[in-house]
């Protein structure tokens, strides 16, 4: 099953059973105690704890999560990932223990064809809290599990609580047995490599008191309502269902791993350390992509620091495989393509994401180049002296001068068998923070430190001139490189430029920063981003394209006119769509978020159900009516109280000062507080084309539109497609829907006939294969290379047919095929062969090793694959040799 199939099966199953399907919340958690959403339950905590009444009795979701606590384990175990998706089903005082167990067992063991996940009951084990006899009996009654496959464990592993007084309760975990090839018998209590946890059911029923540790606390009594909170790791189930060895090889992650292998010239599976590095790349690129799609930006503090660390570990992993050049331009598109089906926003917002990623990579490549040399020297000197610890001042120098995060220094030291004098490092950091002066040897750490901007902010606020002009003459007030104030920057440098005035708009209010340049005598700076790092100060992140720029140089800020035109069209279009929404849906449909860039706008609004196509069309028509009416756009600055008296709309979550800017479009038709850039009349927007509407939470919807040139281009593409269809199908445009429906029905009929013909063709091949069996010890081996096949399923069907027709004598069937350049070997055994010691999983792994890949399965049926089609013959020989041994 593909990851998307597992996700859909989950949501469909629970949705059909009365659960409200809740879209994933952002990775940026609303919980102030969390940097990220770390578990599927996080968005539901207010309901589970009773702080907020649940708006539904039961719910289900597939939640995006980020955890970096075990970041060093990424790539080294089959199931540690920093980004993962958690399937969850929740009950808020509705059903409880028995029903939760029944749901879990039914979904797991129902066949894929009938909407389940298709696990064999024989492969599943469960654990329960050792005092929870109710859960044990429920498992025996519902699943028919014997006592030996229901293991009772203590509070440390099978009792959930928050770590403080509050809700608590026993839990029951479900495990998949990967077979004896992965570890010893004995169940989950003995081996977590062989027995992989796939689902945890938490029975939240008690109130716990104070205590320390995982198990030292008192149960005070029952909760007023009993809740259910369950979590299934989507990636874990995916790697088990896809027959691969770990989560890095599933369909949503493997494309990045393969691209890393191609770029490095290394072969996955050939070297353990290279394999770990490729997995790190695959995991961290995906995590970085998803974080940036939810608005996180690389920085030196908080969430941004975690993102920066992931990206820098990726760069370093590629360098350790011999790739010194930039690779994000290849890796991030591969991850985008793998994830966009489940999360379209990663594709929609990829221009912004990629600009951030590529700039971050270029900066760190330069950091690595200087810092690695110093660290290598320090490692060599330490070892030459017989030492075991790198000096703290060396680690401090790397951090302070070269921007090396301390965790990276610690990691690189450990790889060389050394430690770092962390105590001395921390002491130097403390001394640095207490010094007022900031000379070259004692610059403050970039971690969570904004003091580098203090001297510039003291000179006054940056004046934004971009409302009135696209080019502004100014002077270079300050330059920042690597978190330090410098006097100059040269070609190739990534720097921040501070100016007393600028025509370039800094990202805010949902509007993306302007594109453009800063030019002067002898230098040309490309603007990568414009931000407000501290209140009142605008910082321009630039790359020096040519020349050398210095503090005090005269300069001109130049806004990309096409970009600004598109951005103003999008922002004014957002105001029109917002006003149209409220006209159609009522005043409760207020804006809860927005994003605007040239040609595109996205508006989130409070609403709890999908919009019908008729409603969408009505909103679009009203907004475009305002465009056609050529409404005048007027901006005014006034006290906030006066603005409110005029009815200007203040948006939820935005913070306003005493003086605000009011944007009127057609007078009261649309009146909002807004600091963004806008057209001067609504007709300049050109056209608003609503292209999407979706859910972004239980009480919010999102409407997406193209505006201006992009809207016309999109309609032109649609018109061309319709024209091509009418020509190809020789059908008038108004009859196209019926004609296409007829063609789809004919296609389904043809596909059924083809499937019947293929089944007959497979049946006809069976006698010839049966006739060519040869004896290997006590077993008859039937093996053949089938050449080109449509898919691995075709090979599997033929293997199964041959085994069924082979009779009761011991028989092993091993057939191989080339499925579009991917070699596949399927091995099957009958009962007599298994009694004689033949195991399909072992034989498939022997073949896969020759093919340069992996394999596995059960004793009766297993699959191996790889990348080397030319080795299929040798792989079949390996099966024969493994069987003979």
UniProtKB/Swiss-Prot annotation:
Database matches in InterPro entries: aa-tRNA-synth_II/BPL/LPL, Ala-tRNA-lgiase_IIc, Ala-tRNA-ligase_IIc_anticod-bd, Ala-tRNA-synth_IIc_core, Ala-tRNA-synth_IIc_N, Ala-tRNA_ligase, Ala_tRNA_ligase_euk/bac, DHHA1_dom
Q: Which residues bind Zn(2+)?
A: 571, 575, 674, 678
Q: Does the keyword RNA-binding apply?
A: yes
Catalyzed reactions per annotation: tRNA(Ala) + L-alanine + ATP = L-alanyl-tRNA(Ala) + AMP + diphosphate
Entry GO CC: cytosol
Describe how the cofactor binds: Binds 1 zinc ion per subunit.
Q: Alphabetically, which GO biological process terms does the record hold?
A: alanyl-tRNA aminoacylation
Function recorded in the entry: Catalyzes the attachment of alanine to tRNA(Ala) in a two-step reaction: alanine is first activated by ATP to form Ala-AMP and then transferred to the acceptor end of tRNA(Ala). Also edits incorrectly charged Ser-tRNA(Ala) and Gly-tRNA(Ala) via its editing domain.
Domain comment? Consists of three domains; the N-terminal catalytic domain, the editing domain and the C-terminal C-Ala domain. The editing domain removes incorrectly charged amino acids, while the C-Ala domain, along with tRNA(Ala), serves as a bridge to cooperatively bring together the editing and aminoacylation centers thus stimulating deacylation of misacylated tRNAs.
Name used for this protein in its record? Alanine--tRNA ligase
